[in-house]
Each structure stands twice: as C-alpha cells, then as structure tokens.
C-alpha cells in the first residue's frame, strides 16, 4: 500500500506551486489551509531518496514527548535546531508531551469510551503566551481531535504552521504514534488522519530538495514498516516509562 506516499508527493507538488511569501524576512513558498488526508492502515512514515528522513530521530522525538519533561534537553543530541529554540529558562514549548500526557490523553480515551459519538475528545496544545514575539520556540499545533465514526477512529491535527520538508513528516509520525496509543485503548477499526495546516511551506534553502522529490516521483519512495502498541505499552508511554523490553512496539521505537 502506497496511499500515504502518494498523498505526500501531491503535497510537495502543491506547496511548490504555492505563493512566495517572506515571514520574518525568510523567503518560502506556501499554500494556506491545506488538508493532507492519510490512511491509518498504511505506514505513517514517508521518505523519499531526495530527502532521506531519519526515522531514528523521529522515534527519539516521540520518546522525548512521552517523557513529558519540558526541561529535557536530550533531544539536542539528535537535532541541533532544538538548541537554537530552547527558551532562556532551559525549557521547550514544543515538547508536546507536556500538554498531552497524562491528563489530556486519558480525557480523550475516557470521553470516547463513555460516548463513542462524542465531539469533545480533543487535546489542546497552543496557548496564547506561546505567540509572544520574544519567544524562540512557538508551538506549531493548535489541537488534536479524535472521533469515532462508522466504527472507525479518525484523528484531525490542526496546525498553524508546518515546514513540509522537515516538519510535516516528523509531526505525522509522532501524531500517528499518539493515534495508535489511543486506538489501543478502544474497540474500533482503523480510520483516517487529517493533517490540516494554515501555512504549509518550504523554505528557499530547500527549493532544490523539493524539486528533486517532485522530479523523482514515486520511484524515490522508500517504505518503512512500523508496529502498533499493546494497551500496556501505550500506558507505559503515557507515563513516560516505556522501556525496550515492554513489547514489539517499544523495542522498535528504541532501535
């Protein structure tokens, strides 16, 4: 199945055909209010040879979220950009785990167990104080909504901003892991993931890369298998206690 890879390739084409804008003086191409629809039965990890993304980093970012510690600087070992956006007090606004785990995660699960037709099963990430101009790190995600419709679990992620070269793929991976954790707690079929972004963009320095991805097409696609958590593994992750020997999903994340 290559449904998600085709959706990503179309996304790159759409962004490249977008408008030129210069937020904070940085030239980029942008499409607004973009919707990326993904089949959660397919792999959430989409990589192309022209931009061979680092799945080890994506796993580490998710595990970093699961620890839910806004002062945990271990992520800087895997990507130097985190050092550049660390707040003066040593914290990171964009460690999403501090908002998700454990309280909001369990709210979503319990809400859907009590009322499978609920529209309230949401996780809110962005706070007004994140948007202050003096902040180095500004949260890119507004909220995540989960719904059960026609017996399937659907998820919508709503973002204000997303860099399609680096951000989108890693965000989709991490949010897909969150989806799998919620799914493990419910008796539903697998549904869809809608990734909605106000500003989906590519920076000027990555123009050659996005052109190479588009020109290579599906011949550049590289599939990566992944695992689903058991309820026990998901629970361990919620409390930041997931260890490699907790199961196949845990072992795969730590590889």
Enumerate the predicted regions with their spans.
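Terminal, non-catalytic protein-protein interaction segments that mediate quaternary/complex assembly
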Residues: 1-255
């Amino acid at each position: 199945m290559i449904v998600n890879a085709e959706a990503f390739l179309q996304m790159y084409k759409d962004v490249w055909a977008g408008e030129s804008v210069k937020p904070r003086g940085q030239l980029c191409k942008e499409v607004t209010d973009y919707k990326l629809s993904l089949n959660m039965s397919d792999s959430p990890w989409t990589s192309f040879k022209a931009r061979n993304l680092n799945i080890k980093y994506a796993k580490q970012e998710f595990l970093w979220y699961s620890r839910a510690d806004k002062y945990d600087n271990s992520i800087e070992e895997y990507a130097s950009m985190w050092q550049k956006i660390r707040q003066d007090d040593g914290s990171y606004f964009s460690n999403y785990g501090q908002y998700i785990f454990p309280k909001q995660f369990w709210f979503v699960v319990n809400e859907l167990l009590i009322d499978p037709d609920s529209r309230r099963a949401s996780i809110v990430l962005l706070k007004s104080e994140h948007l202050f101009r003096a902040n180095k790190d500004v949260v890119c995600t507004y909220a995540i909504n989960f719904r059960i419709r026609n017996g399937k679990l659907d998820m919508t992620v709503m973002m204000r901003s997303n860099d399609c070269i680096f951000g989108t793929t890693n965000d989709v991976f991490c949010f897909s892991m969150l989806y799998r954790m919620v799914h493990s707690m419910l008796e539903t079929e697998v549904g869809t993931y809608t990734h909605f972004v106000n500003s989906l963009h590519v920076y000027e320095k990555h123009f050659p890369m996005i052109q190479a991805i588009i020109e290579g097409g599906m011949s550049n696609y590289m599939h990566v298998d992944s695992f689903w958590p058991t309820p026990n593994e998901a629970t361990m992750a919620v409390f930041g206690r997931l260890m490699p020997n907790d199961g196949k999903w845990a072992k795969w994340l730590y590889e």
